[in-house]
């Protein structure tokens, strides 16, 4: 909003549904929309932000149940205790945060969904290559992205935290 007034800033906050009319144009070989009108929904128009959010392809409770079962397939007791303790500590965040701000699994509960799909792949690969240590695969995958609950701000209007920007995936 190039010419936004103070009341626009208060009215059009992140997380609200707005109705916009605009014109698609190209600037520097990049498509953009030039806004013509912007307004809040009127009575009877869709106004629930949840209706416009990407949803996980499976029910998050199924993902939770699957991961809980897979934690018990970690046969090395110390690794299993570490995974269980950290999942307990970050339970709420892990099962609600996206896996990323943009790109892959950038939706609520995307982090848990992404982790579950990777564990499922590891389980299949472990069947094909029995010499692989499935306990190590499962524990490593389950812990690999867990720090995203510290790197990202949460499921709504996701941004990277200071730690996420400065340290991120390298720690």
Task: Please report, for each region that a protein language model flagged, where it lies by residue.
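A ubiquitous short alpha-helical element
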Residues: 49-55, 105-108, 161-165
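Divalent metal-dependent catalytic cores for phosphoryl transfer on phosphate-bearing substrates
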Residues: 103, 113, 124-171
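Extended, charge-rich, solvent-exposed interface segments
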Residues: 30-98
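OB-fold single-stranded nucleic acid-binding module
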Residues: 1-50
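Generic amphipathic alpha-helical segments used as scaffolds and interaction surfaces in large
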Residues: 70-77, 105, 109, 128
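A short mid-domain helix/strand-loop element embedded in enzyme catalytic domains
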Residues: 79-121, 143-151
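Metal-centered catalytic cores of metalloenzymes
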Residues: 21-23, 56, 108, 171
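Amphipathic alpha-helical segments within well-ordered protein domains
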Residues: 68, 122-123
């Amino acid at each position: 909003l190039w010419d936004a007034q103070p009341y626009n800033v208060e009215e059009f906050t992140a997380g609200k549904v707005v109705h916009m009319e605009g014109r698609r144009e190209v600037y520097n070989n990049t498509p953009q929309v030039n806004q013509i009108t912007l307004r809040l929904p009127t009575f009877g128009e869709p106004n629930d932000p949840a209706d416009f959010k990407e949803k996980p392809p499976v029910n998050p409770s199924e993902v939770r149940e699957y991961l809980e079962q897979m934690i018990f397939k970690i046969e090395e007791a110390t690794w299993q205790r570490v995974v269980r303790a950290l999942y307990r500590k970050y339970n709420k965040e892990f099962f609600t945060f996206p896996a990323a701000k943009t790109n892959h699994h950038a939706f609520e509960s995307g982090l848990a969904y992404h982790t579950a799909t990777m564990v499922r792949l590891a389980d299949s690969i472990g069947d094909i290559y029995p010499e692989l240590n499935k306990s190590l695969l499962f524990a490593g995958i389950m812990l690999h992205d867990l720090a995203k609950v510290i790197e990202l701000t949460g499921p709504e209007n996701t941004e990277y935290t200071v730690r996420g920007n400065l340290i991120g995936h390298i720690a």
